[in-house]
Structure formats: structure tokens, C-alpha cells
């Protein structure tokens, strides 16, 4: 169970909720602020002064006053009308993370919802009630309206949810878990759908996967370096200290540790006529390290956003209810674009290492396409082509999304972040990257084995053994698609990196 303190939740907690399915609830000390804000909203709802979202319409209809008797229907109508999502459902793990993020936002005590709303969200997480949320339809301002409306619909007994492996109508799903729908009070519907939690959940998932891919890239690229008998001189700490970038320094140190003790490296330390390796070998710390730095910058933004109150209007500490724009997901959009760039570049340089290893003119005496009998066998020829295709896909998907604003809601919401699909694309990019890195691992393993009787280092030997437990040596042509998929799984699960038995830089 993760106890979430609003404003202080950590990335480690959020990753545990997303990756391990941990349950989560707010710390009890959040309740007084939540209830105080709810009391202030109830007071405003009973008054005559117009307060956006409490006794007015929404968006372009904000100038229309709503009678006190209609405020409950107003909130229900808001949820129903905004359930306009389309496309494939959000992955359940990411949907659960989204709910946890909504709890954190409500827990700041600035949204004005009753504690009953918090308790129902906590109950849904605890009982495994996961709303079915179509993944397309948000422009990332005014919040992730459509997807969050599908979440809120389940809370009022509408929509659909998964529970116990079954997809049920919202009311039935709640009943299955021993929960009851809630009747929304003033502003509660708006508080549930205003916010960036959908975009942020997807961006965090991309971040967590991206960091794991970066760790795998360090291990696999070290194995590739040994496969082509690359030099470790570019990993010397003095080089990286002279530049000073933290990620670069850490990447070089990790690769030095991975290659320490390699007999392959020692065999050509003296007398090698090659003066410099190609950039995809020589500049690995500069590229992967830079990607690590970018991922960390995105992590800082997303950690802040995860703990933010992104509702509108907000109940301030002095009791005033003020309209603002915290629902605008521009920070999340920028973070997602940064993650996309990092994923693309990790894959781009990895693909060049694959191309290097299969090319006999560049691989320092490895056989063409890493097969013992080239000609009769094509070896990894088309596996390299697959990595080129996926690399190109990722390059196209790395184009920024935040620059593509368009006016919505009759020009009331005239600049939007597009953070939702900017974050959502990261899942596809990670899938592609895992295949690129997994294929590189297969190529590097073949290359290292061709250097026998010389052996690689102990850490990389353990990595090679872990790979071979899933992907046998390719001695003759066979259908390689299952092997590529198996290697990609080892990348995504972290099994390949863990096999090295060394500490890795932390996010």
C-alpha cells in the first residue's frame, strides 16, 4: 500500500502503483484541507454570486447562471456530455496510475470535493475497479476532459469498468466490488474531469519505460563494443569530467565497469591499427548520457505535475474561489516531447551499432550478417532492416506535439497543449525501442561468441547467458521473429540489465 502525501508523492511510489499494481490512498492528514474546501464550495453554491462550475455553465457557456435546484443535475450532465472518448482503451495499469494522480490533485484541498469522492476513488483502486477509458479525444486543455469523464462516469454508476477480469457496466462493476455510486455535489464533476492526470499518467509510463530502456542500452552497447573489438579509451573518466554532464559521466562509468576484465578488450589493447572507432561506439556516453539527462529533466517536471492541483477554479487558502489555468498541460506536453526525443536518439545510435556489426567491412573481421555460413544463410540481414524501420518510425513520432495547438470550444479554449497524444505515443516508441535494443543484443551476442576463445567480461558474460536462456545462438537461418520478441521482453522487463549484477544510475 502506498500512502500518498499530497504535494510529496515520489516517482518511486508512482512507479510502484503503475508497474506493480500497488494499492494507494491519501494520507489521513489530507482530509481537513479537503473538507474545508468542500465546505467553502457548498457555501458558494448556496449563494447568489456566480462561481464558475458551481452555479454556471461550462467553457463558452460560463456566463449562463444555473439555478441552485439544478446544480446536482449540472454536474451529472457535465460528466455524461463529456464522455466523448474514442479509440482503444487506456492500459489498465496506466488508468490506475491516473486515478492515483487524481487523488493527489484532489488531496491538495483546492478542488472543493467532499471526502466521499476521495474515498470512492480509493475504494476503486483497492478493489481493482478500473474504468474503461477510450484513449483518444483529449487536447490537454481544459484538462483531459473526455478521458477523465469516462473515469467519473463509473463513479456515478455509468460508463464501463473492468473488475476481476470482466468488463461490466459502471454500476455493476461498483456493486461487484461492494461499492456504491456517488451523487455529485457542487463542482465535483468539474473537479474530477479538470486536470492533466490522463496525460501525466501516460507521460510517467513513458518515462519509467524510457529509463529502463536507457539502462538496457548501456549494457547492450557495452556488449556491442566488445563484439566489434572497440576501444575503451573513449570511456576514460578524464574525458567526461572535462565536459561535466552528469549523464555522460555516469554512462561512461557504467560502461567501464561492464567491460572491466574483458579478455576480448585486452587482446587488442596494443597493436590495433584502428585509430578511432565510429561514432556509434566512440560517442556512446555522450549520446546515451545526454538522453539520460533529458529523461531526468522530464522526470522533474512530471514529479511536480503529479503533485499539482490542476483543477479550475481553485479554492485558495483564504477561501476565495478563483479561476485560473492550471489545467493546461503544456508542462506535460514539453516533458513528453523531451522523452520522445530521448527514446528516438537511444534507438538511433543503437540501430547504427546493429548496422556496424552486420557489415563485414566495419565489424573488424566478424562474418557478414553474423552467420557462420554467409551466402547459404542470410543471418541477421533482415533483422537489421527491421531495426531501421522501427528507428525511422520513432524519428517521425519524436516530432514535437506541443507546437500543434488548435482553437476549441468556440474559441474560448483557444490554445491547447496536445499533451495527451504527445504522451500516449511514448508507449509505441518504447515498444519499437525495445525491439531495436533487443536485436542489438542478439547481434552483439553473436559477435562476442565469434571472438572465442576470447571471453568478454564477467558482467557481460552474465548478460550473454541470460539472453541465451531465451534466444539460442543463431547457427543457421530460422524464423527470427520470436527471438526478436523474446529479446525485446528482456529489455522491457529489465532482466537483461539486471543480469549484469551492477548498480545503474538512478532516475
From Swiss-Prot:
Residues where 2,3-didehydroalanine (Ser) is found: 142
Pfam family, one: Lyase_aromatic
Transmembrane region(s): none
Pathway info: Amino-acid degradation; L-histidine degradation into L-glutamate; N-formimidoyl-L-glutamate from L-histidine: step 1/3
Entry's Gene Ontology molecular function annotations: histidine ammonia-lyase activity
Coiled-coil blocks: none
Protein name (record): Histidine ammonia-lyase
Provenance organism: Cereibacter sphaeroides (strain ATCC 17023 / DSM 158 / JCM 6121 / CCUG 31486 / LMG 2827 / NBRC 12203 / NCIMB 8253 / ATH 2.4.1.) (Rhodobacter sphaeroides)
